[in-house]
């Protein structure tokens, strides 16, 4: 493991210890109080967020009799805005967007008060091109038609950061397209764009479907982890996409970043407890929806940097005695 990797794990371990020590027991929580409504902001159909959100909503309808819906969105940035406005109750959000939201930095105009219920799986940034494309590295995108993800998505924010780290201005040096995953995959298949960015779990269903229609490659991006960490903190890590994921020619290094299940910080403790409990009770259903859900676990779940674990969620983890 690299020095950066060891350093990152040490920070993660200290964060877990900090949560365990600092968050006090909630003797008055009184157990779960399931809400009557659970609107879950997720992302594009064809992405992992959407698959997991659909399974969680179905579990809430079945177990609670709640009015629960999987809300299709542009993903992380829009999810935070919907959550802050009270239009949804819970959201799946990538950690770098959470950091920007709580700090009130672009694309947010002011700090947003959030808390986390659980850390979920990791996203992998996937820069997809056709197998016969001349694009071999990020800088080969100059002048080409590239989808950087839906507007107001975590994909767009991170794609822009990676492009800037590579010396490319996404507004000047690319023919930028802002497409959802389904639109972008279809455009690449038809030759209407030259590449697409998407940040998601593995395999991303929409990319797997595209790979079944034509040979594709992923462009290596791992070299940009260091400048991203230098510019934006320790949220990013080096990850590899196995060749078997999409029948790729070889394993590809890329940028990884965690995902969190988040709520407004003022959510009632008993409601936060109930939603966290539902997440783990319904985990078999989530795994059936997408295998990345098997990565959800109590040990890593409390490591919700860069935002605090909600006290109600902390109480759930204590009650299950695996904290």
List where the protein language model places each region.
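Segments of small-molecule ligand-sensing domains
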Residues: 252-323
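Bacterial N-terminal signal peptides that target proteins for export
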Residues: 2-16
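C-terminal motif of bacterial Sec signal peptides marking the signal peptidase cleavage site
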Residues: 25-28
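Pocket-lining segment of extracytoplasmic ligand-binding domains
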Residues: 95-97, 105-106, 133, 170-262, ...
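Bilobed "Venus flytrap"/periplasmic-binding protein-like clamshell domains
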Residues: 35-68, 122-190, 299, 303, ...
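Acidic, polar ligand-binding/catalytic clefts
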Residues: 88-122, 132, 201-204
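Extracytoplasmic
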Residues: 35, 65, 75-78, 85, ...
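Bacterial signal peptide processing site
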Residues: 30-32
